[in-house]
Amino acid sequence: MTQSERRLFLIKYLFEEREACRASLPPMNEEEQKRVLRSLLNIREPKEPNADFLRVQDAYLQEEIREKGITDANTLEPVEDGIYLWHGDITTLKCGAIVNAANSRLLGCFAPCHLCIDNAIHTFAGVQLRLECNRIMTVQGYPEPTGKAKLTKAYNLPSEYVLHTVGPIIGGKLTEKDEKELASCYTNCLVLAAKKGIKSVAFCCISTGEFHFPNETAAHIAIKTVRNFLKANKDIKVIFNVFLQKDLDIYRRIFGIDG
């Protein structure tokens, strides 16, 4: 199957699953098809699809990621011992584990085509990720607390695993509690990674987007926490993944990188 054929197969399956399929799909260009497919994946509840869907979905997502271009963490240059800075799309990074800035449901973002990292990671990992997260949360029986960490497979992403953590939500003035909770996100992800023998972890800028944590303060907390952890745990590579130019500028300034 071509990518176009896979995309239309998946759209038709997801419409039929929702009992909303028309006799024939309306004409759509490639970008419209991609938006419709992503929207349907985003709103899909965690339930087992059939084997044909998974086979086509996996082939489709892996090709989409390959076309975006995969970056191997082993090719990155450190900014200091054990620490790396990378500007790019975390869903294209090949490493031990990437960190997802999750919400307390831990099921991913249900808003169609939302631009948050939670949406992107669940979209390109595939429906299996939401299924695994749902199993974890069903067993747990209560919302995920702020500052903790959970580990899942990464499925169709280039990384081996995804670490999920819920950062603090800032609704007013930043507090010491907020800062401690953010530090806990980094520490608990690294502790869990070390426990599982994961050798490289890529952190997004936790809480700085939809959760409104001040970017510069968050970066200082992230770097300080990671440096402290690496003093006693030198076997893990830590990658600070930044997507926005302003975050890249902040991290470069803190690390003293020119240009």
Which residues make up each language-model segment?
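Macrodomain-like recognition of ADP-ribose-binding/processing modules
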Residues: M1-G259
